[in-house]
């Protein structure tokens, strides 16, 4: 850990503590400032943590909580961004508060909900082992644009995590299409019995 990385963590932890004392929430702001001090901080802290990332238009929080329950039942040591801060700044804060100043995470696993618009930037730094994509619909057009733009954001994000196993909704054709042009191993889930099979 170099000086700037340690400084970024110290500032983030201090701001998070002050925000909690003042009851201001303060999940995103500490991470935003930490990344200005050391832009590679998330990548540094996430490299030794086995991470499941969940993104998509609907169902991110529910799917994340279901993943957490599976970890609980298996007795796994994990943390999650339950606060709903699912952009890169909030995700960075969660990694900082779950790590020592040496950069060692106190948990073995992480369950991270990621805003679909942030996937392009987050996945390349997070390098998750599993990426769950729930579905893709037109949503908040003023913020996200057309759904094809959101699909491209997620696709570009996955390209930054080539080792990740994709868990895709086979009942959503746009989501399932991510398996067609990416080298990642893909498995599928869905209600329809004709859901796409796993692809090696």
Which residues does each predicted region cover?
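Gly-rich Lys/Arg/Thr-decorated short loops/hinges at beta-loop-alpha junctions or inter-strand turns
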Residues: 72-73, 129-138
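Short, structured coil segments at secondary-structure junctions
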Residues: 74, 126-127, 181-184
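Conserved nucleotide-sensing/catalytic segment adjacent to the nucleotide-binding pocket
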Residues: 90-133
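Hydrophobic/aromatic beta-strand patches that form the interior of the parallel beta-sheet core
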Residues: 52, 79, 130-132, 167, ...
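Walker A (P-loop) phosphate-binding motif
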Residues: 39-86, 155
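Acidic, Mg2+-coordinating active-site environments of NTP-dependent enzymes
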Residues: 49, 106, 137-200
């Amino acid at each position: 850990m170099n000086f700037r990385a340690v400084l970024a963590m110290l500032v983030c932890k201090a701001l998070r503590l002050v925000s909690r004392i003042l009851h201001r929430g303060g999940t995103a702001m500490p991470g935003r400032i930490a990344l200005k001090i050391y832009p590679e901080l998330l990548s540094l802290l996430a490299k030794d943590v086995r991470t499941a990332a969940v993104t998509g238009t609907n169902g991110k929080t529910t799917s994340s909580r279901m993943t957490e329950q599976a970890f609980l039942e298996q007795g796994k040591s994990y943390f999650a961004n339950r606060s709903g801060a699912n952009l890169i700044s909030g995700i960075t804060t969660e990694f900082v508060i779950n790590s020592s100043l040496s950069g060692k995470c106190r948990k073995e696993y992480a369950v991270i909900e990621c805003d679909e618009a942030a996937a392009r930037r987050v996945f390349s730094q997070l390098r998750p082992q599993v990426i769950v994509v729930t579905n893709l619909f037109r949503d908040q057009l003023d913020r996200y644009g057309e759904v094809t733009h959101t699909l491209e954001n997620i696709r570009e994000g996955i390209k930054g995590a080539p080792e990740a196993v994709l868990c895709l909704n086979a009942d959503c054709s746009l989501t399932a299409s991510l398996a067609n042009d990416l080298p990642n191993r893909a498995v599928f889930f869905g209600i329809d019995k004709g859901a796409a099979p796993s692809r090696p």
